[in-house]
């Protein structure tokens, strides 16, 4: 477990690291009153963007990832459009490296937006409980879902 105070303290450093990630096209740290959110847009393929949010799960007291997939298109008149994609598990696994991670779809109770959520039940077992550098250990594992070479960037 990671306290909310430690999460908020460590997240700005993580935002700096993630901004160096070659797949990240946009990185924004949103400082809310109680907790902070890191928003990352990343190009996965030419016409596919992943909108990723790292936030704090107050129930489990660990960081959490939610994401959405956006497909981009150009029509005959070069007008661009984007649509939200909802894929089967097999299709999703062909785009991102879920490996042993489980993902579910659910809606945000406040905004009613639908997101994929990475299951965070085993977070402490995966990254340990020592608060120092907790988020660094966490992103080096959990962001590999989106880029298996990410841990090299963090060394």
From Swiss-Prot:
As recorded in UniProt, its EC number(s) are 2.3.2.-
Extract the Pfam families matched here.
Answer: Autophagy_act_C (PF03987)
Q: Which gene encodes it?
A: ATG10
Q: Which InterPro entries match?
A: Atg10 (IPR016524), Atg3/Atg10 (IPR007135)
Which family is this sequence assigned to? Belongs to the ATG10 family.
Task: Name the domain of life this protein comes from.
Answer: Eukaryota
The taxonomy runs: Eukaryota, Fungi, Dikarya, Ascomycota, Saccharomycotina
Topology within the bilayer:
Peripheral membrane protein
**Which Gene Ontology terms describe the biological processes this protein takes part in?**
autophagy; protein transport
Summarize subunit and interaction data from the UniProt record for this chain.
Answer: Forms homooligomers.
Which keywords belong to this entry? Autophagy, Membrane, Protein transport, Transferase, Transport, Ubl conjugation pathway
| Function as written in the Swiss-Prot or TrEMBL entry | E2-like enzyme required for the cytoplasm to vacuole transport (Cvt), autophagy and nucleophagy. Acts as an E2-like enzyme that catalyzes the conjugation of ATG12 to ATG5. ATG12 conjugation to ATG5 is required for proper localization of ATG8 to the preautophagosomal structure (PAS). Likely serves as an ATG5-recognition molecule.
> Active-site positions, per UniProt?
121
**Localization terms from the record:** Preautophagosomal structure membrane
Q: What is this protein called?
A: Ubiquitin-like-conjugating enzyme ATG10
- What is the originating organism of this protein? Kluyveromyces lactis (strain ATCC 8585 / CBS 2359 / DSM 70799 / NBRC 1267 / NRRL Y-1140 / WM37) (Yeast)
Under Gene Ontology molecular function, one entry of this record is: Atg12 transferase activity
Provide GO CC annotations from the record.
phagophore assembly site membrane
